[in-house]
A protein has these predicted regions:
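Conserved N-terminal beta1-alpha1 strand-loop-helix module at the mouth
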Residues: 1-74, 82-86, 90, 121-126, ...
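Glycine-rich phosphate-binding active-site loops on the catalytic face of alpha/beta enzymes
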Residues: 90-111, 149-152
């Protein structure tokens, strides 16, 4: 029997929940209250996308993710603005069970390799815009990634 998860998504910009990857209008909810609502509603996992533009905003979002993890009991995964292995570490140390690496970035395989060696492949996910990545990197995917997120 297949196991299905109900997953909620939070998009973070400047430490606040916004409406989407391309819509930075605030959701109108405090992000901690939103995460608690998901936690109390039977959601299995929250995926958080860090939409930061610079290191200062990235650190603010990491701090927000750490606060979310302190306030929920469900799995939290995060990704976004990952350009080096240290960014993966920041998400893990903020309490995320899994980290999402962007498959479209040229250095994603190097980051994933180092992260899966350090933290285990079950903690590393890859996001792609289309399934071409899967066919081009099939061996590496099995070795370094636990799940695939197709964002379309």
């Amino acid at each position: 029997m297949e196991h299905k998860n109900i997953v909620a998504t939070i998009y973070l910009k400047n430490g606040q929940a916004v409406k989407g990857m391309d819509n930075f209008e605030p959701m109108g909810w405090d992000v901690i209250s939103l995460a608690r609502l998901y936690n109390d509603s039977g959601i299995d996992k929250i995926i958080i996308f860090d939409l930061s533009d610079d290191d200062e905003e990235h650190e603010k979002n990491i701090h927000t993710i750490k606060n979310i993890n302190r306030n929920v009991e469900i799995k939290v995964c995060a990704g976004g603005n990952i350009s080096r292995f240290e960014d993966v570490k920041k998400f893990i140390y903020a309490g995320c069970l899994q980290v999402i690496v962007n498959g479209a970035k040229s250095n994603s395989m190097d980051i994933a390799r180092e992260a899966s060696d350090r933290f285990g492949k079950e903690r590393i996910l890859v996001s792609v815009a289309n399934v071409d990545f899967v066919f081009k990197h099939q061996e590496e995917m099995q070795e370094h990634f636990h799940e695939l997120l197709v964002l379309n």
